[in-house]
A protein has these predicted regions:
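Solvent-exposed loop/turn segments at secondary-structure junctions
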Residues: 28-32, 89-92, 116-120, 166-170
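C-terminal signal-anchor/stop-transfer transmembrane helix together with its immediate cytosolic
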Residues: 180-201
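Extended, hydrophilic extramembrane loops/domains of integral membrane proteins
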Residues: 150-183
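Membrane-embedded segments
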Residues: 1-81, 98
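VWA/integrin I-like adhesion module and closely mimicked acidic/polar interface patches used
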Residues: 56-60, 82, 89-156
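Structural recognition of the beta-strand scaffold that forms the well-ordered cores
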Residues: 24, 85, 111-114, 162-163
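Short, hinge-like loop/turn segments at secondary-structure boundaries
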Residues: 39-42, 128-131, 179-182
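Helical mechanochemical/support elements of P-loop NTPase systems and associated helical scaffolds
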Residues: 39, 58-65, 146-149, 170, ...
Length: 201
């Protein structure tokens, strides 16, 4: 699923022009993989280097990732800002809906894409082929797609929730929405500017 998301983001980057993009990766914690930039070649390079090994803490801290993404924007810019959350798991670490509300108060729209399975799937152990994470009681940990939370996050951020299919991740639809949002903003202001878009895992 990670490779599928990376390919979709790479294709989206190819369609950008005069837009800023950044990358944040998250599991049990969130890290800036690529600061906001218009250097699309660097974006694709940093994207290609993303793997499950670069985040040491397991989990799904969506709220931390949203907070970090929101802080990464240039504060005083008048351009439209969007965060796209792509995840395949449940959120256990923090209050992601509250984080989305706080980000939206700063003028940031939050979109979410769910890539997991509602019935869930075991989480592979790093460096241990064929073995899966276990909880304190020795039970295999099952990571399930929590669509309700992702819908709530998108609602709090006045964005869209998209369930990824086997053939389409949903980034094209979100890119159209972000471009529409920017066009509406430009019509209101009557001058041209560029959008600050933020992409992260």
């Amino acid at each position: 699923r990670l490779e599928k998301a990376k390919m979709a983001i790479s294709r989206m980057v190819e369609k950008l022009s005069n837009d800023k993009i950044g990358l944040i990766v998250f599991a049990g914690d969130a890290y800036v993989q690529l600061p906001i930039t218009t250097d699309y070649s660097s974006a694709k390079l940093f994207l290609s280097n993303i793997s499950t090994d670069i985040v040491p803490v397991q989990g799904t801290a969506i709220g931390s990732a949203i907070d970090l993404a929101a802080r990464s924007f240039t504060p005083e810019t008048e351009t439209s800002k969007a965060i796209i959350v792509i995840t395949d798991g449940e959120n256990h670490q923090d209050d992601a809906v509250a984080a989305a509300k706080q980000a939206h108060e700063k003028g940031i729209v939050i979109h979410t894409i769910g890539m997991g399975l509602e019935q869930g799937a075991p989480i592979p152990e790093k460096g241990k082929p064929g073995q899966f994470m276990q909880d304190g009681q020795g039970n295999v940990v099952i990571s399930k797609l929590d669509e309700q939370t992702l819908q709530d996050i998108a609602k709090a951020g006045e964005g869209l929730y998209i369930r990824a299919s086997n053939t389409e991740v949903g980034l094209n639809r979100l890119l159209d929405e972000v471009n529409r949002m920017e066009k509406s903003l430009l019509e209101e202001r009557g001058y041209s500017d560029y959008a600050e878009k933020y992409q992260y895992f």
